[in-house]
Amino acid sequence: MKRRVVVTGLGAVTPIGNTVDEFWDGIRAGKVGIGPITRFDTSEYKVKIAAEVKGFVAKEHMDFKAAKRMEPFSQYAVAAAKEAFQDAGIDMEQENPYRAGVIVGSGIGSLQTVETNYTKIVEKGPSKVNPLMVPLMISNMAAGNISIQLGLKGKCTNVVTACASGTHCIGDAFRAIQYGDADIMVAGGAESCICPSGVAGFTALTALSTTEDPMCASIPFDEKRNGFVLGEGAGIVVLEELEHAKARGAHIYAELAGYGATGDAYHITSPAEDGEGAGMAMKLAMEEAGVQPEQIDYINAHGTSTHHNDLFETKAIKFALGDAAADVVVNSTKSMIGHLLGAAGGVEFVVCVKSIQDGFIHQTMGTTNVDPECDLNYAVGAPVEKELHYVMSNSLGFGGHNATLLVKKYEE
């Protein structure tokens, strides 16, 4: 018998706030965290804007030595995980460490480490690379560092599915608790690749918006959309088996009730044109949760602001919900914080949980003229306030990776 899984802790580092409270205040206020790139000189780059994390000081979240052994994606992950763990009120002295684990992903890891050490090889020779180059670079170190910092000795893994990584991590952590492998899981995603090779690579792929006005660059579902804006940060949650959470008197934010994951088997970057793969992920999540399409109140879309994603995700929602798609509110958090790649699903799951808590669906900022081919309710022009019972979050990754989480208002 599957065990029920609830959300008991939230953590976030984002372009509009480095804690959940700061982030959610920014979301409610419609704050846009996109601006000129400050990390390097962009004079020769077509793309000059991104959604950078601002004012983050790693040593405020860990000791100096630990911080020096982590690249930004790992630092963001540890900071968000510590916030979520503290929020959940878990005392590891009272827990079996082998029943508490971590599944946190990063789509890329550290391109910065690759850049720095390749320059050393070219200029000074291979003997001059940082001895810690490999552990600084590899994407599993977000999960590894969280495990070390929090003393979690259970399942510790890393899912890499590009822009769906964070959502798959939360889904797989959900499964670990459902089937009895763990009682507590720290899950989500982290990313930081606003650097020369990251921006150049995505620009060459024609994936990024070349608009220089930060308010008009990430405009999901708008007829003038022309690409996504690169973002960074981390979104981490604590998932817990229901009876375990109740036994220790935990505050329960919401219940995670369904998870769907599919593959398009179609193209290395483009989602399937009929939306069937992403639509099936939503259907599977609803089926597991025992929820009908007409019960879905809100969908936090992948909504990247690229032509193909927004059009095909609209088709996917229609495939999954049928006639009920016309009544659901859809939005995109990427309109405010850009695309956090492997961290996107984690941060957007936090948005879904907070939306249920507050009965608040944020506006899709910047979007003013909805593409006629995207014909759903995208929360354009104003936020929506309504009681939310069932909410879905979608993530779609390069390679055809589709993932959907269904979270519901907690009831005994």
Region spans (language model):
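Condensing-enzyme catalytic core mediating Claisen C-C bond formation in acyl metabolism
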Residues: 4-8, 35, 213-289, 298, ...
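Conserved beta-ketoacyl condensing-enzyme motif
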Residues: 7, 28-161, 190-199, 295-311, ...
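Short, well-ordered amphipathic alpha-helical segments that serve as non-catalytic structural scaffolds
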Residues: 77-88, 142, 169, 240-242, ...
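Active-site-proximal alpha-helical scaffold in enzymes
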Residues: 77-90, 139-143, 147-191, 229-250, ...
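Phosphate/pyrophosphate-binding loops at sites that engage ATP/ADP/AMP, CoA/4′-phosphopantetheine
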Residues: 84-96, 245-252, 282-298, 320-324
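Glycine-/small-residue-rich "gating" segment that lines the acyl/pantetheine channel
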Residues: 123-130, 168-171, 175, 191-247, ...
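Acyl-CoA/ACP chain-elongation machinery
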Residues: 181-226, 259-273, 303-310, 327-377
